[in-house]
Amino acid sequence: MSSRALTELLCGKGAHADPMACVEDLPADLAARHVEGFPHSIGHLVFHMNYWMDYDLRRIRGEMPAYPEHNAESFPRNSFSIDAQKWDHLKKQFADLLGDAAALANSSPKEMQRHIESTHAGHTKLAGTIEAVLWQLVTHNSYHVGQIAMMRRMLGAWPPRGGGDSW
């Protein structure tokens, strides 16, 4: 697929929900609320997506971030509470990281094929180019943005102000 398609998916064009629209108008109390049947709140999912986007973008920049021993490390601790200030910070970080990823998606074809150093044995089993890492990032975010859309529906907060299908 093209870098245009990658950018469109990062920014929620076409049939894909806009990740920022799914969180930007949600108040902190709803972002912090746990929905029955879901192990994490919306705020926790945004924290988790931020964690992995930051991790991948740092790898792309040539840093060697430590890979967590367990996925639980990519979620906030149980004692983490989300107030309005923390929620605003999480949303700003989310927007900034999405913007950084979208800027990278517009790199030259040669740059998109640049190999990224592995920081974990699992990376050696996957394609390790900038393009491949960005596609993994989009797919990961898509999964969690879908969860957020479902949770918002269950909380009676769908569609978001920025728009979203409501079949």
Regions found by a protein language model. Give the residues of each.
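Acidic/histidine-rich alpha-helical segments that form the ligand environment
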Residues: R77-E117, E131-T139
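Short, contiguous alpha-helical
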Residues: T7-H16, M20-V23, D29-P76, S118-W167
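Acidic/proline-rich low-complexity IDRs
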Residues: A5-E8, D25, D96, A103
